[in-house]
């Protein structure tokens, strides 16, 4: 996969935030964690992921460009916190008490589990499914699982199995 081109100013802002938060964590925790690798390989509606064993943060270049300062202020510390929690506590719940503590007490950032960025520009095709009470939009991955007979999905409200609305797909 080609590495997306990120404006140098955006990359510098990401790295400045990362280094500031890492230094803050090292001082607070009296540790000497090294700087993780940063790549811009994240795709889809996911803003970022922390690759624990690789000590790497992968960021979504499209969402970074569309939401620059909010992305840097929220996503970079969020993913760094995952790495720091893994280094300090090992495998624990992804957004559990250790992660919340790392975000709020160490990095001093509100502990939000998900972003609220607009994702229309990065969202893939969806497929309409129906139940007895509403319409549901399934991703292509979930749609293909239904087609292959690997799974079925149920409505959380009425409990009925979702059925593909073929008319809306034409």
Swiss-Prot record:
Where in the cell is the protein located? Answer: Cytoplasm
Q: Which InterPro entries match?
A: SprT-like_domain, SprT_Zn_ribbon, Uncharacterised_SprT
> Which NCBIfam families does this chain map to?
PRK04860.1
The entry's free-text remark on the cofactor is: Binds 1 zinc ion.
Q: What is this protein called?
A: Protein SprT
Q: Which cofactor does it need?
A: Zn(2+)
- Identify the residues that the record assigns to the SprT-like domain, covering every copy: 22-163
Query: One MF term from GO for this chain?
Result: zinc ion binding
* Family listed: Belongs to the SprT family.
Annotated active site residues, numbered on this chain, are 79
